[in-house]
Regions:
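Extended, low-polarity transmembrane helix blocks
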Residues: 1-37, 47, 54-63, 67, ...
């Protein structure tokens, strides 16, 4: 049994970081692409939330989601990308999922779920910030 646990730990340490980076990339890269494709609709939604300079904020959002997602996928400055996305998600979560202001019970539950999901994503990104990109990354690659 001890051998199985040791082997599981080795596999998790070797492949966990790249699988985690791939899953984060699968979330943020399509989100950034969607915002490019549907720029005006997303801009209108951001305007409805009372945000100023929505086009500038939307371009920054695209850069963070798409650029950060690609950086995570490749393992290129993954700690910086993870920290940037985590810090970006804090105000995004508070602004776009304020479940405490919603009276309709169903909408409140939905927004609370979205809020907590984002908090979990922030937690995972902070773990990645601390642990780094792992073995299979551009950082770990040896180019000679």
């Amino acid at each position: 049994m001890r051998t199985v646990l040791t082997n599981s730990n080795i596999i998790a340490q070797r492949f966990g970081p790249i699988l985690g980076r791939m899953l984060f990339a699968a979330l943020f890269i399509p989100a950034g692409v969607h915002k490019i494709i549907d720029f005006s609709t997303v801009s209108g939604y951001m305007t409805s939330k009372g945000l100023p300079m929505v086009d500038v904020l939307l371009v920054l959002t695209i850069i963070i989601e798409l650029g950060g997602g690609l950086m995570l996928l490749l393992g290129w400055h993954a700690r910086l990308a993870a920290l940037t996305i985590a810090l970006f998600l804090i105000p995004v979560t508070v602004i776009f999922h304020p479940y405490w202001n919603i009276e309709d019970a169903q909408q409140m539950m939905t927004q609370q779920h979205m809020f907590m999901k984002n908090m979990a994503i922030i937690g995972g990104l902070l773990c990645m910030t601390g642990l780094g990109s792992g073995k299979f990354s551009l950082k770990a690659a040896k180019f000679s």
